């Protein structure tokens, strides 16, 4: 959520930023309502002051034994008018809030201008895609042939876009989760959190999923609970309605969770295999920082996520996301894309975002500066560290052998207790 003063003081800049994001918000109506509200509050304050004065006058007349009935009648009319105006102010504020909730975060000045993912800018690559002397298979074929993935059974039990991991497949998924957590905790300094997999509506609002993206969320029937689309939601909301001691910043958290998404509007896009599932595992990175440190922390977070892929020997590239592809809550975002041989292209495996104070305003997360000054909103950052199912898929594709087996990356062997998955 943007600072109202920012919109009020520089509406044209906000309007341009919204257009660059490809979003829509009625800034003119917002400004009209904002001015109306401010005028109404001034008038309301004047009426309340008058009521206070007349109350004193009534009390004085009564003490003097004089008739105060006319003044009492006027006071009743005045009180009714105040009550009516308070209701009008409430209605104006509710409409203001509804518009404010639709206004996206403002892109950082360093974000490239563009309309879609075709305008994202590659900034670096790591590793060389492997050259195969045989035709590489897609990960879903490899997994089914090795009997470590079962899409058909999951479809019978639940439906499409779900998977059973079996045998060494289940062990590989678990090994990846533990490896990622261990790396981020032991080397990068994150504190692990194991969050609830359900949150209520206010938490989804706090991180920006609601009200705009409700159609992409799984709601628990008959309750106010939602299955989390990412651990970013519960971990960020751990600090909702709190003031953090400035000496404790920055705060680093990592969390494993299952994630649940409708993937509305994604029909036909990567629907085979593990790339676009309704339920998937992810290790999430979340940071809370002082405003002047958040972009430095974004670079660190992105490097932390990259190190997972480097340790696994998976080629990848990093792109900075353009304005039109940036999303609702982020001011700046990097995507890390892993090489998938059967696709012949890089596929997103992590997004690392700086939301500045956008989520903090929605969730009311502040910090007390070290000098003891007035509490300010923190900056929040989040990133995948990384998506586990997509990493599983990338390992199957990049480490597949001609005989159908898959070599286990060396860093995972202590977790797996085997070097190769084979028939």
From Swiss-Prot:
Pathway(s) it belongs to: Aminoacyl-tRNA biosynthesis; selenocysteinyl-tRNA(Sec) biosynthesis; L-seryl-tRNA(Sec) from L-serine and tRNA(Sec): step 1/1
Keywords recorded for this protein, A-Z: Aminoacyl-tRNA synthetase, ATP-binding, Cytoplasm, Ligase, Nucleotide-binding, Protein biosynthesis
Binding annotation for L-serine: 230-232, 284, 384
Main localisation: cytoplasm
Class in the EC hierarchy, top level: ligase
Location(s) in or outside the cell: Cytoplasm
Its EC number(s): 6.1.1.11
Designated name of the protein: Serine--tRNA ligase
Assembly information from the UniProt record: Homodimer. The tRNA molecule binds across the dimer.
Any one biological process term the GO annotation gives: seryl-tRNA aminoacylation
GO molecular function: ATP binding; catalytic activity, acting on a protein; serine-tRNA ligase activity; transferase activity
Organismal lineage: Bacteria, Bacillati, Bacillota, Clostridia, Thermoanaerobacterales
Residue numbers binding ATP: 261-263, 348-351
Presence of keyword Aminoacyl-tRNA synthetase: yes
SUPFAM superfamilies in alphabetical order: Class II aaRS and biotin synthetases (SSF55681), tRNA-binding arm (SSF46589)
């Amino acid at each position: 959520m943007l600072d109202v003063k920012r919109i009020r003081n520089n509406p044209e800049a906000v309007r341009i930023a919204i257009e660059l994001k490809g979003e829509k918000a009625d800034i003119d109506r917002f400004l009209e309502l904002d001015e109306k509200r401010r005028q109404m509050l001034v008038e309301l304050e004047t009426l309340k002051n008058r009521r206070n004065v007349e109350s004193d006058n009534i009390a004085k007349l009564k003490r003097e034994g004089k008739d105060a009935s006319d003044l009492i009648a006027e006071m009743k009319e005045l009180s009714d008018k105040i009550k009516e105006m308070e209701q009008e102010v409430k209605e104006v504020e509710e409409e203001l809030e509804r518009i404010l909730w639709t206004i996206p975060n403002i892109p950082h000045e360093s974000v490239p201008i563009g309309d879609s993912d075709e305008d994202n800018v590659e900034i670096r690559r790591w590793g060389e895609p492997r050259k195969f002397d045989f035709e590489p298979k897609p990960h879903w074929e490899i997994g089914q042939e090795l009997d470590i993935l079962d899409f058909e059974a999951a479809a019978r039990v639940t439906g499409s876009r779900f998977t059973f991991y079996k045998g060494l497949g289940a062990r590989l998924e678990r090994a990846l989760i533990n490896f990622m957590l261990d790396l981020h905790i032991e080397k990068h300094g994150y504190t692990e959190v194991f969050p609830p997999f359900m949150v209520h509506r206010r938490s989804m609002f706090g991180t920006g999923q609601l009200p705009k993206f409700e159609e992409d969320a799984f709601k628990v029937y008959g309750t106010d609970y939602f299955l989390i689309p990412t651990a970013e939601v519960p971990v960020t909301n751990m600090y909702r309605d709190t003031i953090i001691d400035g000496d404790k910043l920055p705060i680093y958290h990592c969390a494993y969770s299952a994630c649940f998404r409708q993937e509305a509007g994604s029909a036909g896009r990567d629907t085979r295999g593990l790339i676009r599932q309704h339920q998937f595992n992810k290790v999430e990175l979340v940071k809370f920082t002082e405003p002047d440190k958040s972009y430095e922390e974004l670079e660190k977070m992105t490097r932390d996520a990259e190190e997972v892929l480097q340790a696994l020997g998976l080629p990848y590239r990093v792109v900075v996301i353009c304005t039109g592809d940036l999303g609702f809550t982020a001011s700046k975002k990097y995507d890390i894309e892993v090489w998938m041989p059967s696709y012949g292209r890089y596929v997103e495996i992590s997004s690392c975002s700086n939301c500045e104070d956008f989520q903090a305003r929605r969730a009311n997360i502040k910090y007390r500066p070290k000098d003891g000054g007035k509490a300010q909103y923190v900056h929040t950052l989040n990133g995948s560290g990384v998506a586990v199912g997509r990493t599983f898929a990338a390992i199957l594709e990049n480490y597949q052998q001609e005989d159908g087996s898959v070599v286990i990356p060396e860093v995972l062997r202590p977790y797996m207790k085997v070097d190769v998955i084979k028939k």
